[in-house]
Structure formats: structure tokens, C-alpha cells
């Protein structure tokens, strides 16, 4: 008899925890296009603007292990509530950041916001895995993760329709060139104040939504799911055991490269489109199309897992991503942009599948193992500034630098494909 993906007693808690996946998806994807916005309005190079992503995902690296230790000592619910509190604080800090018009203040706000996201991901992912039979854990997490892109596409839509379309700094002349850099300092200051307020407002609204979710989960009685390692093994012992498990160890590496490819493809699609003459808002609309493909592929790939091994599908989809990125690099013009959009169709199963493969069979070390996989996110955050540095070159090896910069996602897909193959055929 096949094990159920989700038992009836877990439905309401599952729905509440799954809503968190949409919340961090929203934060991720309203933030991605802000790299291009800060680059223009603060008049900084792409490499410096990409520090937005380093700050955003750096919070994961800082807080993943503390979040795991906190959840182990108290409970998954306590970890989730603390995560929501930090999330709200970071969002509300956008108000003073916009008032003072300091780029580094925005970075600090994002850094604190992602302290909260680290708590949420470190606790919500293993909580979902624990809500039922271990045999269906990866399918259950893939299903829960299916709602993450719903938050993502909402964040993209808000960025496109409520922020990017209202930016004074993105006004162009008849030839399609930005005019912001040609204005007087007084005009720039006025526009900067206006545009930073446009950036600020969605984050403030988001803060209030997070507070509401905090109250709902705080008042709801959640099922007690045992956290195996609490009080049983030391931190050092858990780390030692994890380091000896090749499937886990290599999974952390693969996860870092997956996060890198996701951030780079969804952040720099705007710059790729701008080089072709599109506005930031139009570039973000292409990102929304990519996310729609991502969502559709998520549900399709989750259904296919009933018939195909997760490890095999991971390898297959990584090869597809590799081929589409080749088009991004070597096909100039709008067809290269279409290849970049298509790449999103190969990405949706990767994060939860790597997560499920790496954690499968772990017991006492499961929460700390989850923290290690969340920490891997910061590894991916190191890649966007490097891609920004390539873009700043203008041209590399006869190719537009923005095209050539996608050699980094190309390498990422190679690493993921190798992990999928090894997990399928070699690692036990």
C-alpha cells in the first residue's frame, strides 16, 4: 500500500506552514530587480549594486545554524515565530533607510530581514518533511515548495507594476537611452528621494502582512513533531556525522550552486533585457513570464516524481538548464532572452529535490543538516557580485559582457547535473 503524501491530521498545519514558502518567495523576487534600480538611482556600478544579493542571502549564512540550534532547543513553532518577527523588523527598517537615502542602510535592512528568512527556511522545510511518512517526504516538500513561486510571482508583479513603472530615474529619451545621468544634481536628488520611497512602500506593507501571519500561527495549536537531536548528540558530533555522509556533503555544494543559478538568472534578466533596449519594467515582465513557466514546471515535475527517480530527474533538468544557458550566451538578441526565460522551466525541482536527497535517512542530525543546506544559500549569494563585475566590463571575448556573464550559471548546472548523476548511480 502506497504511503500518503499528507495525512488528514496535518492538513491545517501544512497549509499554514506552506504559506511561509510564499512569504519568502515574495521577499526574494521583489528584491531581485532592485539590483538594477539601485544601480541607476544610487549611481553605482553593477558589482556594487549586486551587494543587495550578498546582503540578502548573507543573512541565511549568518543565522542558519543559530536557527537550527534554537529550533532544537525549543520547537519548530518557536523558530518560525522568531523568524517572522525578524522578517517584519527588517521590512520596517526600509522606512528609515529611505528617509536617510543611504544604500548601506538598505543593505542592513535586507540583512536583518533575511535573518528571519533563515529561521523560516531552517524550520519550515524539515517541519514539512516530518509531517508524514519519510518515503513521501521529498514529494511532500516539492508540493509545499510549489507555493513558493506563487509568492515569487506576486513579488515580481508588485515590483513591475507598483515600483519599476513609477521610477523617475528610468525615464528615457527618444533613442531609448536613460536620461537620469544627464540631469543636474538638484534634479537627481529630487528623483532619488521619489524613487527610494517607491522602493520602500512595498516592504512596509509586507511587514504588516508578516505581523498578521505571526499572530495567526502564534494563536494556532501546531502538532508537536519530535526534533530527533535535541538533547541527544552534541553539535560537534552532529557536524562530524554529516561530514562523513557523501550524499549530504555533496548536496550542500550542489545547493549552493543551485541558489547561485537561480539568483543570477532572475536578477540579471533585467540587465540582459535593458541591453536589448527594453525598460526595467519590461525586463521585469519577462521575469514574470519566466516565473509562470517555473510554476507550471514545478507541478509537472512533482507529478513526474511518481514515476521517475528524483535523482534522475535532477540530472535531466540540470542538463536542460545547461543547454538553455548556452543559448543565452551565444544567441544574441531577443532569442537569447527567450532562452533565459526558458531556463526557469528547468529549475523548480532543484532546491527541494537536492534538499530531500541530502537529508534522506538522517535522524539525530536532521535539523542541523537542514541548517547546512540553508547556509549553502550564502554560497550562491557570492556569485551575483562576480557576475556584476563581468557585466561592468562591457565586452568579453567578442561577446556582450552581460551575455558572457552567464557562463557562471552554465558552470552551476554542470555541478548540479554531476550531483544528480552521483546521487542516482553512485552515492548511498
Swiss-Prot record:
The reaction(s) this protein catalyses: L-fucose(in) + H(+)(in) = L-fucose(out) + H(+)(out)
Cystine connections: none
Main location: membrane
CDD domains found in the cross-reference section: MFS_FucP_like
Entries under SUPFAM superfamilies matching the protein: MFS general substrate transporter
Topology class, membrane: Multi-pass membrane protein
Localization in the cell: Cell inner membrane
Keyword Membrane: yes
Membrane-spanning segments: 10-30, 51-71, 78-98, 100-120, 147-167, 204-224, 250-270, 288-308, 311-331, 339-359, 371-391, 401-421
A single cellular component GO annotation: plasma membrane
Function: Mediates the uptake of L-fucose across the boundary membrane with the concomitant transport of protons into the cell (symport system).
Protein name: L-fucose-proton symporter
